[in-house]
């Protein structure tokens, strides 16, 4: 009889242990699923900012990042004056020392399954103390996935075309030096390829950057002004346009 009781007790202990182990696995699985869900939500196409309703030169801007809707104004001819306060930049530094995501950006949502071209004449306010001052065109997916094309002041006081692509962290590419106060800048996609260009006359284009369009079906494009070091600046955008076609020659930009 004693042997039978001992056997039954052993079986009960084994069953209880197995049940506890299954519960632990279930709880662990639930926790992992929750963690994955949170991570997925954090990595979704989230854009910081607020909803706005601004139309400039036929472009409907519906997202304002860092108060851009209060800092960009357009005259009757569509010329945009874009203010930026002191130390406003947008850059995800690889070592995080220079990360700063405070620059104002005005964004318009577009269908990335269709070709598009964003163009503007850009005139930044360059000053002696205005290191990295720039007028900027953007492609924007979320806060950690974007590209900007800048007409920017460099460390030697030169003015040049600069491109930055961010996938988690930002790269930083200095391109040609520009000696005129204004240039035309363009970002174009045929749905497969995206390229960035600049021009002095809106006729002869110089390619700056080209890569595969691996952005999702809906993205944002827009304009911005940045002033990472100085006390504030202005940038001007003229002849702003957004059309549903792409360049036909990606090397020449026409």
Annotate each language-model stretch with its function:
Residues 16-19:
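C-terminal motif of bacterial Sec signal peptides marking the signal peptidase cleavage site
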Residues 21-23:
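Bacterial signal peptide processing site
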């Amino acid at each position: 009889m004693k042997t039978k009781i001992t056997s039954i007790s052993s079986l009960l202990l084994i069953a209880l242990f197995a049940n506890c182990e299954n519960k632990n696995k279930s709880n662990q699985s639930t926790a992992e699923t929750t963690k994955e869900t949170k991570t997925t939500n954090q990595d979704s196409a989230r854009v910081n900012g607020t909803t706005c309703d601004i139309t400039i030169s036929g472009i409907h801007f519906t997202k304002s990042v860092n108060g851009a809707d209060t800092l960009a104004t357009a005259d009757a001819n569509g010329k945009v004056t874009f203010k930026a306060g002191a130390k406003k930049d947008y850059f995800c530094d690889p070592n995080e020392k220079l990360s700063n995501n405070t620059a104002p950006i005005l964004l318009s949502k577009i269908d990335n399954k269709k070709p598009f071209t964003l163009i503007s004449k850009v005139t930044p306010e360059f000053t002696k103390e205005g290191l990295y001052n720039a007028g900027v065109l953007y492609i924007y997916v979320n806060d950690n996935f974007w590209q900007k094309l800048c007409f920017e002041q460099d460390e030697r006081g030169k003015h040049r075309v600069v491109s930055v692509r961010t996938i988690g962290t930002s790269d930083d590419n200095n391109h040609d030096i520009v000696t005129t106060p204004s240039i035309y800048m363009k970002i174009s996609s045929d749905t497969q390829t995206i390229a960035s260009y600049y021009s002095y006359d809106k006729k002869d284009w110089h390619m700056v950057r080209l890569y595969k369009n691996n952005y999702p079906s809906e993205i944002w494009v827009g304009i911005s002004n940045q002033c990472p070091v100085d006390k504030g600046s202005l940038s001007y955008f003229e002849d702003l346009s957004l059309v549903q076609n792409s360049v036909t020659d990606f090397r020449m930009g026409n």
